[in-house]
Amino acid sequence: MKQGRLNVGVVGSDASGIAMAQALAQAGHMVVAVSQAPLDSDDSLEVLLPLAKKVSEEKVLELADLVLLAVPAAQIEAKIESLSNSWRAGQLVVHLAAEFDHEILAGAVSAGAIPLAIHPAMRFTGTSLDLNRMKESFFAVSAPVVALPIAQALVIEMGAEPIVIESSARASYAEAIEVASNFSAMIVNQAIGLLEQAGVPNPALVIAPVIESAVDQALSKGHRQIKPEDLIGDS
């Protein structure tokens, strides 16, 4: 391993963890182990992370200097506890959930691990598109003061932009991400369905410019009171 390079391991199979492992590999780190093959990808583990061995979760922790917890937010504490005898001093442990800061990793910290919360503000597809989109994205970071530069440096190495989210603001941040992601998907799905009912060919292609221009306009205007004239369909 090169000077300053880390052996990276992934516990879990969430698409965000696999994509971040790929990005770290591109930055020169070595992804050495994963506990599960990715569930949300059409590509095999050998294609996505060719140098990684599929091993037990405990073995991932044994091999890795940096552990990505690619598990659902509701499972983080239980996962940390189930591996309580495997964490070690100086090991970096990273969770990827929007709603929690680094303090949820206290169980690993008690063994001397260094906790980092790194959440990519993007919607993952489980495809190669994720790596390119990461380079246009912001990652929310949270860590103890002495470890915050490590979290920021890792994000920069992955090609993204780190933003520090304070513990008190984490819930609002997570809600914003959820609203933007879920409501966008629901609205697009509804619009495509209406066009299909109307017999419009290629409904996704037809509606795409409308959605893109509406989103661009809303982003440029920022948060404000929505007026009736803003909602006129043919304006």
Where are these regions (language model features)?
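NAD(P)+-binding Rossmann beta1-loop-alpha1 motif at the extreme N-terminus of oxidoreductases
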Residues: 1-58
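NAD(P)-dependent Rossmann-like dehydrogenase/reductase catalytic/cofactor-binding core
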Residues: 2, 204-235
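Phosphate-coordination loops involved in phosphoryl transfer and adenosine-cofactor binding
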Residues: 4-7, 90, 136
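Hydrophobic anchor at the start of a short beta-strand
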Residues: 8, 30-32, 115, 162, ...
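Internal alpha-helical scaffold of NAD(P)-dependent oxidoreductase catalytic cores
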Residues: 20, 27, 48, 108, ...
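Rossmann-like NAD(P)(H) cofactor-binding subdomain of soluble oxidoreductases
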Residues: 20, 47-129
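Short, charged/polar "capping" segments at the starts of alpha-helices
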Residues: 39-45, 101-104, 147-149
